[in-house]
Amino acid sequence: MRKILIFLGLLFVMLSNIYAQKGRQAIGFGLSYVTEIESIGLGLKYQYNITNPIRLEPSLNYFIENDNVSMLDVNMNLHYLCPVGRSVKLYPLFGFTFSNWMYDLGDGFDIDVDGDHIHIDKDDDHHNECRVGVNIGGGADFVLTSNWIMNFELRYQLVSDFDQAVFNLGFAYRF
C-alpha cells in the first residue's frame, strides 16, 4: 500500500509539472490590413496553449471604413508552434472565420438566407453581409521579454465571394 501511495504521489507531481508547461496564456492586440476592402484594422486576441506546440487563438478585428465598406471579423485559429531559435517560433495556422461586411447600398429592407451567408438590407441605406469561411496561413512569434511577444501573421480567408489575404502585426502579454 505504501508503494502505491508513493507511486501515485510521484505520478501526481509529474503530471502537475507537465500540466504547468501547458496552459500558457496570452492576451494581445494587433494592427491588420485586408486586401479585399483595402483597409486597416484593429484587433484583440487571446491565446491558450493546449499543449506546448498547439495553441488556440480566438480573435476579434474591426476594419475601418474605406470606400463606404467596413468589416468586423471573428476568428478561431489553431497554431502549431515550431521553434527555430531560442526566441523565434514559426507556425502554420488553420481556423474558421465569421465576417460581417457593412456598406451603403440604397433604400429598402430585405433579408435573404443564401447558403453560407445572410444578406440584410435596411431602410437606413446600410447593407450587411455575414459570411462564414476558413483561414489558412502562417506566422512567426518573436520573444521580446519573458512576458512580451511580437508576431507577424499572414492568413488567407476563404469566404464565398469575399476571399482575401490578411496581414497582421501584433503584440501579446503572456501569463
Predicted feature descriptions by range:
Residues 30-42, 63-71, 86, 156-167:
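Solvent-exposed loop/turn segments connecting transmembrane beta-strands
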Residues 1-24:
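Cleavable N-terminal export/targeting peptides
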Residues 26-29, 117-124, 151-154:
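Extracytoplasmic loops and strand-loop junctions of Gram-negative outer membrane beta-barrel proteins
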Residues 3-4, 56, 156:
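Hydrophobic alpha-helical segments, especially transmembrane helices
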Residues 19-56, 60-63, 174:
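Short glycine/proline- and aromatic-enriched beta-strand/turn motifs that initiate or cap beta-hairpins
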Residues 47-115, 131-132, 142-150, 168, ...:
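Gram-negative (and chloroplast) outer-membrane scaffold detector with strong preference
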Residues 32-34, 46, 62-66, 80-82, ...:
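Outer-membrane beta-barrel proteins
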